[in-house]
Amino acid sequence: MTELKPLLIELGTEELPVNALPSLSRAFFEGVLAGLERRGIVIDHGEAKSLSTPRRLAVLLTAVAVEQPKQYRELFGPYLNTAFDTEGKPTKALEGFAAKCGVNWRTLERIRDTKGERFVHRVVVPGERTDALLPGILTEAIAGMPIPKPMRWGAHEYLFARPVHWLVMLFGQDVVEAEIMGVKAGRISRGHRFLYDKPVSLSDPQNYIDVLQAAYVLVDPAARRARIVAEIEAVARQVGGVARITEDNVAQVVNLVEWPSAVLCSFERVFLEVPQEALIQTMEVNQKFFPVLDSLGKLTEKFIGIANIESNDVAEVAKGYERVIRPRFSDAKFFFNEDLKQGLKAMGERLRTVTYHAKLGTLADKVARVLVLAEAIAPQIGVDPLLARRVALLSKNDLQSRMVNEFPELQGVAGHHYALISGELPEVAMAIEDAYRPRFSGDEIARSPLGKVLGLAERLDTLACGFAVGMKPTGNKDPFGLRRNALGLARTIIESRFDLDLKVLLDQASDWVAFATTIEQERHAQESVKQSKKEAAVKHSLPQVSDEKSARIEELYDFIVERLRGYYADKGIPTTHFNAVAELKPVSLYDFHRRLDAIGRFAALPEAEALAVANKRIRNILRKAEIKIPASVDATLFDQPAESGLLVALEGVITDTRSALDCKNYVSVLTCLARLRPPIDEFFDKVMVNDENLMLRANRLALLQRLGEYLCCVAAIEHLSN
């Protein structure tokens, strides 16, 4: 049985970049494992650990084979007809092969294959020792790491993310002889930079985590995360609050400390006059602090910092954190007060001075387009068009605020606060912020109907603009954020259950964008840039429907639907189901969703596969038809009972499902379609479609055409066929 030993590799460095640390740690771990596996060295993956702190990358494996397995090789020699001459003496071919193998030819074995009998030499190659292979494995692992900005240090030519100061390589209790980037491997690690700044001797990989913990280093990121969250929650409870803990913030802090310790801090209550989102943004993004909220979710004057030490004077540490945060809060308060002085209306007046796009006018022009779209969408989902007009008019004003200029992430949020202060209706103010949802993947859609209207109008205009000026996404480039906007638009429609005609909305958006580009062309053509839109509009009416415009609407529709492919894939929806619905191009995305749900249930029926195969067969027959197919079926031409049986069954299903189809009860429709399997099977078993009699053939093709159309009334079910 192969002997197994624990393996520890630790690379000690200066503080590694916080954002790069997770990927560096993962690549280091995977590189070491891949190197061992490539060499056939047995590893117990169940106990493999990837460990890291800001000052070290480590791989801990509890069971690694001490050597490669033996390799059994076969060297094939000449066949007998070329191995011996006519006198039965070995030829040069046989003697040369034996010499190459280092044996007498008489000791060679013989095997038989399809060409005859030949000589073979079997040899057992002992595996190399793992400790001899580890230096090369480590070198390969380091070379394969994604280092964002490699650096040199001292007089060395080595390149790494940060200077390397020590290297631990223990295989069992033995040090592996190696030298990496000018550092010789040993058993000496280092403790915490401040709490235990001295060498730490490691005798056994199995004790690594415990020995480092005694030196004030939690080398397991999961352990640091657990301690950070537990301490933050405990400290917040002490002051009767609830800590705001986001995954992004915790992930950053985990990679900033080796020995986390929560510190309660506070700031002056006067800063709470500033919108809490600005203060939270400053604490979390700029300083990696954790805000403390009250039971209603309102920000308190308390916050929590995570120190990398256990201080004897926690109050002094807290003062340091408070000194850091105070100037930033003062700036936020200044920006807020300056914005209040000018007011939301004045901010909006400056939008006409900001270019949205050279071919699309200013931000004020964009607001005008969004306003018209919002008015059109509002009554379709039960929202007051006047409110939609008002919220659209105010929607971009905060882009000219000092607050948003300093904190771009607060666009919409700042507008919400300024609208309330200006006396706008609460639902109008909320919609200004709400329309930006979803802001990122996994975020919730807008909560209020008014916010949804504005969000849809905004995204429709952005999409139409992007395509109109040739800013379609290519590869990783998406300057208008069209992919994100398309998915946000689709999610809002589907998750809100809005039965809207997407192509009509895209048509309206494209009209106004085309109008905007016409106006801009007119502006540039005139000597005076002050020519009004009214003057230009006299000369240029809204574009009429054209082939080019229709093609663009289809392109936009396809672009939006394609974004749903990944959305549904994440929900476990098979691609075949998605393709089945997408082929029909439902104009309502909510209708698309309902069809997709129904096809999922239909696919579970025992008849589904057979009907899918039948529909595929029908399509193939119709595609290959070389005669004109009548528009209707003539029952008097039937000469087989299976023909009339199929037509009767089909007409019965059509009658029984007409109401369900009108009500878009697609599950009921597809369930009824399952009744057609027996007559379809009977038809294909008993009837020759391509009969020599052209009248019979044409009539049977007409029957199949009608059947095929109804089988696809919900989705193109042939996609379900395996």
Curated annotation (Swiss-Prot):
Recall the GO molecular function terms of this protein's record.
Answer: arginine-tRNA ligase activity; ATP binding; glycine-tRNA ligase activity
The record's subcellular locations are: Cytoplasm
InterPro entries on file: DALR_anticod-bd, Gly-tRNA-synth_bsu, Gly-tRNA-synth_heterodimer
Q: Does the keyword Repeat apply?
A: no
* Chief location of this protein within or outside the cell: cytoplasm
Q: Name one GO cellular component term.
A: cytosol
Q: Which GO terms describe its biological process?
A: arginyl-tRNA aminoacylation; glycyl-tRNA aminoacylation
Keywords noted in UniProt: Aminoacyl-tRNA synthetase, ATP-binding, Cytoplasm, Ligase, Nucleotide-binding, Protein biosynthesis
Q: Which reaction(s) are listed as its catalytic activity?
A: tRNA(Gly) + glycine + ATP = glycyl-tRNA(Gly) + AMP + diphosphate
Q: Does the keyword Cytoplasm apply?
A: yes
SUPFAM superfamilies in UniProt: HD-domain/PDEase-like
Enzymatic class: ligase
Q: What is its EC number?
A: 6.1.1.14
Entry-linked NCBIfam families: glyS
Protein name, please?
Answer: Glycine--tRNA ligase beta subunit
What lineage, starting at the top, does this entry show? Bacteria, Pseudomonadati, Pseudomonadota, Gammaproteobacteria, Lysobacterales
